[in-house]
């Protein structure tokens, strides 16, 4: 037996020991604890608005913190800022690269960011004196595509990339202030904790990791998926997070229990998950799928509570407003739909 093979076996044994130690601490399952809770019943949501304007696949969307404006990014090379109440376009921003994969709205509402196969995170100022939108900063540094970005504030943004790293940037200087390394596959998604001190990442190594923004360290790693993790989203309390994967399952991981609590899957679902988001209370988990639908899961009991059907192609992105009153889904059919 080669030395490498021996080390592989030892690592596998250690992994199993860790799994066993976690299970030993697990005095009850979430299903047991929630067994006497009422189910959420049938969740039926309607499309209240359809946002038409993109001319090609929509790849990403992100709500503004006012729960009214949202930004979307499309293969047509446009970033559009929408008023979800009126369906009006506030801004249509032409991008230098049409291969955009992610977009983000700053908490202040002053900036939006985007990036993709250009490996650059571009920051746009929406509140210029002249009234026009322009690039205020470009952040080059990743050696792979930009898969996700999220603002901490107007001065800092976190990005994840196909180069297997995440990075914290000082927007003013354009420099990476912290690099988060540890994944062994493309990092596909990130989600900031409510207190903005940590974030979780999901990657093509089928693992998700919790990172400390303050010191750049990986605090916890979570495994269980058997394929790429495409999406991650923090539970509103900040003590748990959900993941969505190409293995056709979503999973709920608890930071304090240090393990998986629940698996969301259905015999009829055999396609990958592109996006996940919790309702404001955390009781519902919404997940977008390659089969054109969006499933609504009972986050605590694990059952499927509803389906949002209406898109004519893959649901590529979704988001719940800060006030919890609406869900937006974006699709390869070039439309965004607002549901509640």
From Swiss-Prot:
G proteins are composed of 3 units, alpha, beta and gamma. It comes from the Eukaryota. The modification Phosphohistidine is found at residue 266. One of its GO terms (molecular function) is protein-containing complex binding. GO terms for cellular component: cell body; cytoplasm; heterotrimeric G-protein complex; synapse. The gene is Gnb4. The modification N-acetylserine is found at residue 2. Widely expressed in the brain. Highest levels found in the hippocampus and layers v and vi of the neocortex. Belongs to the WD repeat G protein beta family. This is Guanine nucleotide-binding protein subunit beta-4. InterPro entries: G-protein_beta_WD-40_rep, Gprotein_B, Guanine_nucleotide-bd_bsu, WD40/YVTN_repeat-like_dom_sf, WD40_repeat_CS, WD40_repeat_dom_sf, WD40_rpt. Keywords: Acetylation, Phosphoprotein, Repeat, Transducer, WD repeat. It comes from Rattus norvegicus (Rat). Guanine nucleotide-binding proteins (G proteins) are involved as a modulator or transducer in various transmembrane signaling systems. The beta and gamma chains are required for the GTPase activity, for replacement of GDP by GTP, and for G protein-effector interaction. One of its GO terms (biological process) is G protein-coupled receptor signaling pathway. PANTHER family: GUANINE NUCLEOTIDE-BINDING PROTEIN BETA G PROTEIN BETA. CDD domains: WD40. The modification Phosphoserine is found at residue 2. WD repeats lie at residues 53-92, 95-134, 141-179, 182-221, 224-263, 268-307, 310-339.
């Amino acid at each position: 037996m080669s030395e490498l093979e021996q080390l592989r076996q030892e690592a596998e044994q250690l992994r199993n020991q860790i799994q066993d130690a976690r299970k030993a601490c697990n005095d009850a399952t979430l299903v047991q604890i929630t067994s006497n809770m009422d189910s959420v019943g049938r969740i039926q949501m309607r499309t209240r608005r359809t946002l038409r304007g993109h001319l090609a696949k929509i790849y990403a969307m992100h709500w503004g913190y006012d729960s009214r404006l949202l930004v979307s990014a499309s293969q047509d090379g446009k970033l559009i800022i929408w008023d979800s109440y009126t369906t009006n376009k506030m801004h249509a921003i032409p991008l230098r690269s049409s291969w955009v994969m992610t977009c983000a709205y700053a908490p202040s509402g002053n900036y939006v960011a985007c990036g993709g196969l250009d490996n650059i995170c571009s920051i746009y100022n929406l509140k210029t004196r002249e009234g026009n939108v322009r690039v205020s900063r470009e952040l080059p540094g990743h050696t792979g595509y930009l898969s996700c970005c999220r603002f901490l504030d107007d001065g800092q943004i976190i990005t994840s990339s196909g180069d297997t790293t995440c990075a914290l940037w000082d927007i003013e200087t354009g420099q990476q202030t912290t690099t988060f390394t540890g994944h062994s596959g493309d990092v596909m998604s990130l989600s900031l904790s409510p207190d903005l001190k940590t974030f979780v990442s999901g990657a093509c190594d089928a693992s998700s990791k919790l990172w400390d923004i303050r010191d750049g360290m990986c605090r916890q790693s979570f495994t269980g998926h058997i394929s790429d993790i495409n999406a991650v989203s923090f539970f509103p309390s900040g003590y748990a997070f959900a993941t969505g994967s190409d293995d056709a399952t979503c999973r709920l991981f608890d930071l304090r229990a240090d393990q998986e609590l629940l698996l969301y899957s259905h015999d009829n679902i055999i396609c990958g998950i592109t996006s996940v988001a919790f309702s404001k209370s955390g009781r519902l988990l919404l997940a977008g799928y390659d089969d054109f639908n969006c499933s609504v899961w009972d986050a605590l009991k694990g059952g499927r509570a509803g389906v949002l059907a209406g898109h004519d192609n893959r649901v590529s992105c979704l988001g719940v407003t800060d006030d919890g009153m609406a869900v937006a889904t974006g699709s390869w059919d070039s439309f965004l739909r607002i549901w509640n």
